[in-house]
Amino acid sequence: MKTKNPFKTNTLQSVILCAVALGLLIGLVMTDSAFAQAAAPVVKEIVQSPAKAVLTPNSNIADQDKHKRYYTIPNFRLGGKYNLDAPPDTWRNGGEGGTTLESLGSGPLQVAYIAVGTPKRNAKGEIINGFIISTFYSGDSTWMYNTWYTKQPANAFSGGEIVGPGLAIDTNKYYVVFLDAIGLWGASKPSHGLGRKFPHYSYMDMVVANCRLLRDHLNIAQVEVATGVSMGATQTWIWGVMYSPSGYVKAIMPIGGTTASDGADPVGQWTFRLGTAAIESDPNWRATNGNYYHLPKGNHPNQGMQFMWSTLQLTGYTFPVRSATPWKTLQREVFYWEPKGEETATWIGRVKNEDAVDYWYRNNAGFNYNINNELKRIKARTLVVHVTNDLWLMVENARKAAAAVPGAAFATLSDPQAHYGVFRAPNVLKDTIKAFIDNTFTASLPGIGGASGGGGGGTAPAKPAGLSK
């Protein structure tokens, strides 16, 4: 959606608030040459999910949709349990006891991605320089591409370009894959038609399904680095737990994620419980118990979604930023059951392309998530990055998680955008992050608190042991 920019453009505050108002939904077209570099095995690709009507778009950024590619995985089990002591091949089809979409009358599980960069292959023709970027809570590959990839319209939100030739994530060196996640946009989701019959998926399901995409579809035999921001960082932690012991993933760099969002993280749990409660407070949800797909879009729980976004965004940015913003401007983001004029306008526009059941499931995936006891399994080089003034995911939890991984390094930054500072982190800590990616890391780089997040940069070893893995 497009809204009139009410701010001066030369202040940080205007960048922050206008980015939210705009939703960063303006895209440019990626050149064909970028995909010409991204060679992959030839498979049949699909445009939309099979057999089911799509109630929500396949891409967050419509203008980038043409670059998204799809892959289907038959008989993948969602919502099952994973035995982490078993070999990864035992997870190929999801967790034990899970439910397949086919058993519910749907088509097979769908995953989606955008790939750029330069594949390097071994003698078998397998790609051995994979670099994966998992998506965040409400995003997808088009959003991350539109924000991080070189010469895109939303680069300013992340403080400049991050992915491209010669950049921190160098497409001359790596074959970079932006990934969607099960539950929203181009991946299988409740709004493909199953609604509340859709299986309750987990973050582990997201990672295992995307690993199938990498191995079976893109023929990637080695992931050099896995990263992502927010929920993308949460998935990055899981990539480390599940796929670094075998050596498939060599390095992980979670930026602003969490290793637990159950009761072990009271603030995070509280924050997103409020979001779910907001959805469930909508009269249309209550009248249908969330089974409303037979109704016109105007009769869906759209106000519940607006309410959810309003509750989340209160703490999405620092309170000084919010307090310094005129009330008339903030009213666009404040929820009203009976809005007048510009009240709630930001969220009224946004939720036209979103679905309440999709987000109800997305929240639910986090409520029972906790891998704190599994962090010792990580064998990858590890750099944990976190925003110190994040009001959703507390920095101390990230510090403790880093300390649980032998040899991990911990880097921090402060940002007026609070949690949203995760998108800028690779530019704010450019030297640190590029050095980690290129495996030339030292503990005296900007933002580093030392190995495992403890101590000062001056007393830490030149290269923490874990970073030599």
Residue ranges: model-predicted function:
Residues 37-130, 445-451:
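Catalytic-loop region of hydrolases
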Residues 114-192:
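N-terminal cap/lid subdomain of alpha/beta-hydrolase-fold enzymes
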Residues 167-212, 265-286, 291:
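Cap/lid segment of the alpha/beta-hydrolase catalytic domain
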Residues 224-225, 230-263:
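Conserved hydrolase catalytic core segment
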Residues 248-349:
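Alpha/beta-hydrolase-fold enzymes
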Residues 378, 384-386:
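Short beta-strand/loop motif that positions the catalytic acidic residue
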Residues 391-397:
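Conserved alpha/beta-hydrolase "acid-adjacent" motif
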Residues 416-427:
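Catalytic histidine-centered segment of alpha/beta-hydrolase-like enzymes
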